[in-house]
């Protein structure tokens, strides 16, 4: 096995393990990892299957209510955010939301991995805990 295949397999396993750590081990994940030459950013094409019907309007309102998430919902060519465009931003950008049927949705998600990662997440979690429990 060559080095690149080994790295990609480890990244795929890490993606699955971290998602299951957050959402529980029962969540099924079909992951594909690809290394592409970008200066900054992580990008994910996410396909979600739900047990309940998806109300796209409610989902859009909910996403827009979260600080740190930015929805780019343009139904035109180029109406999505690229990793390069996320550079220098703290937000996680969601675009290309599309419903396959009432129970499946696809998303394109990008973020600047140098800004939005474990360090910033830790600060934001700490701020939220202080706001909730110490004020």
Predicted region positions:
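Flexible, glycine/charged-enriched surface loops at secondary-structure junctions
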Residues: 29-30, 72-75
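C-terminal helical cap and adjacent loop that interface with cofactors, partners, or active-site loops
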Residues: 49-51, 64, 82-135
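Active-site-lining helix/loop region of Rossmann-like oxidoreductase modules
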Residues: 1-62
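Generic structural "secondary-structure junction" signal
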Residues: 5, 36-41, 71-73, 94-99, ...
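Glycine-rich active-site loop/lid that clamps phosphate-bearing ligands
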Residues: 74-83
